[in-house]
Amino acid sequence: MAERDMEQRRWERLITWLRDRGMQADGLKVERRPRSDGGYGLFARDACAPNEILFSIPATAMLNIKTLRPLYASWAQKLSATQLISLHLCRHRPVADGESSDPAFGPYISTLPRDFDFHPLTWLVEDGGHPYKILLNHLPPAVFRDLKDLEMRFSSDWAVCQEHLRDVKRTESDYLWAWLNVNTRCMHYRVKSSASDPDNLALCPVMDFANHRPEGPHMQPRPTKQFPARADMSFVAPGANIGAGEELYFSYGPHCNRKLFVEYGFALRGASGEVDVDDLVEGTIQQREDGKLSQELLENEGYWGDYTIHSSPEPNISFRLLAAMRLLSLPTSQPPTSPNEAVSAARHPLGFEQWQQTLYGSRDRLSAEIEEQCKISVLQLVEHIKARAKDALAALDHLDWNGPAHVMDMVKVLWEEERDVADTLLNFNLPLW
């Protein structure tokens, strides 16, 4: 109860600070409340009409390169948005249960999560044997691969920023806390002339208490102007009536659980069903006698990697996976002896040129025999995925785990998604192409 009272006081101080920044906070239609799962969410205080403006956040209350660069010397101009916002949070991280001493954004920083023990990047980066580290050995291969990629992004930013943190004696652990706040809570906010510039992001008070769910209804952001920067940001109710006390959600996008887990640190049953099968397909290719050649041919055509299977919106395999499986279904004597031979049409082996035509859109299918072999190979792949997922889930059931049940459940959801996507494809009449 004491912790919730403290969080409520922080919420009240945040609203007072926002009011001082120009926010119209009288009769505020939303508030942060505890959820039944132990976390927090954003809830409607009163009934809301469809598309009604719920709240507006002044541009000066958001953390982005426009609001932070004036607080630092010229070296800050060279930092990316992620690096600069993370650096500022790191410098002003609250100590223990205390409040942030930042004179510019302290009341907001004090409302941010105090730790990210639940996030897999913490398990990977923290020294001293994090208690959840054992779960890293039980992640799907594609999830662990993407997590290592995230670690590289973090390490790169830490290498740039650490020299600007020595005066306040901040550690890599402090920067990890700050960086994960940025990576998990920032929203798109236009500050650059190019709409696709990676620096178009900001931490936005109040909005960042809203949880994600894959399907609507959702709140929607409405900037007061598209550009130039420094636009206030309004948030409108979903296009349906919202009752008093209902939770308000925000959408991070139609992500599969691999993305949600690696980037945001959670997984949801019912997320967009997708399984990355790069490790299985690439492993199969590399074990073949003609594996090096097959890899080169796929690379030359731009079809190496990013192989996926899906259960929604309809069960299917990606065209990239289909291209690879068709190539592997050609008789081993058909591909040219080197990629250079493909330059000469006269030396194209039987079936290889037709395979290329399926990539360019001038041909829909290969011969019935090759398509049948492709179907068999896809079925074997999907069966392998299902069996691997079942084995992984059984191993998790027998793991000596003393941590929180919801953390273990996240990892199980990843494997359940792989199993269920495979099941869905097997229950359909392949081929689906």
List each language-model region with its residue ranges.
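Long, positively charged leader/targeting segments at protein N-termini
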Residues: 2-61, 66-70, 109-433
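Eukaryotic helix-linker segments that join adjacent hydrophobic helices
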Residues: 66-121
